């Protein structure tokens, strides 16, 4: 039963689905390779990449995330609790390039709610693909991905997800997205208030 359902879903996919997926994967891989190469070529800096790397590394080793460069706790600067799920990854992958790979994947994931929103509003697979291309080619998205590492990068897919969920009346998903948005940074509460007008 589950296999038949999966086969039917795969058959329902079109060239537009495949194109959007391929472009998203290509963009994500390109961004991950480009940013890790820049990092290992000494193209990143202590602000802000080093702050997050040291803080997460300390948490992964059971220590308080006191960042020496700032002279205070990592979460004393911004309440970016969205970083906590990265701690177990530091147990497995010790490379500093991990943060750039995660950031590229997170930014790429935003293509999915963009696709779903466009398809829901326009009912057109080609236009949904165009929306994904517009998302991936947006200069702010690529700049965010290439300008060191920032937890704010998680806002791109989370905001897109929250907007989709609100427009689709999926309130459980909406609430989940809003909670995750609030975990990115303390000042996102202002955005969430505005987002409430949609919801």
Task: Name what the model sees in each region.
Residues 22, 84, 92-112, 129-132:
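Loop-to-helix entry region of an early transmembrane alpha helix in multi-pass inner-membrane enzymes
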Residues 154, 160-173:
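Membrane-interface transmembrane helices that cradle and orient dolichyl/undecaprenyl
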Residues 48-74, 81-82:
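Extracytosolic helix-loop segments that constitute the early lumenal/periplasmic catalytic or substrate-binding loops
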Residues 144-152:
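Short acidic/glycine- and proline-prone juxtamembrane loop motifs at membrane-interface regions
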Residues 2-6, 10, 191-199:
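Perimembrane helix-loop-helix junctions
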Residues 105-137, 156-157, 172-176:
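Transmembrane-helix signature of polytopic, membrane-embedded enzymes
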Residues 16-46:
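Transmembrane signal-anchor helices characteristic of membrane glycosylation enzymes that use polyprenol
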């Amino acid at each position: 039963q589950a296999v038949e359902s999966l086969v039917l879903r795969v058959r329902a996919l079109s060239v537009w689905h495949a194109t959007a997926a391929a472009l998203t994967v290509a963009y994500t891989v390109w961004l991950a390779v480009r940013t890790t190469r820049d990092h290992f070529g000494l193209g990143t800096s202590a602000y802000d990449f080093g702050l997050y790397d040291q803080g997460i590394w300390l948490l992964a080793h059971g220590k308080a995330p006191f960042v020496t460069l700032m002279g205070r706790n990592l979460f004393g600067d911004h309440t970016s609790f969205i970083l906590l799920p990265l701690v177990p990854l530091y147990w497995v992958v010790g490379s500093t390039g991990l943060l750039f790979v995660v950031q590229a994947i997170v930014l790429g994931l935003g293509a999915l709610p963009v696709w779903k929103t466009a398809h829901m509003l326009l009912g057109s697979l080609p236009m949904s693909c165009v929306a994904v291309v517009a998302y991936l080619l947006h200069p702010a998205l690529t700049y965010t991905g290439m300008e060191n590492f920032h937890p704010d990068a998680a806002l791109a897919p989370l905001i897109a997800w929250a907007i989709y969920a609100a427009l689709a009346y999926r309130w459980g998903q909406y609430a989940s997205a809003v909670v995750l948005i609030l975990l990115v940074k303390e000042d996102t509460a202002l955005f969430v208030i505005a987002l409430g007008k949609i919801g």
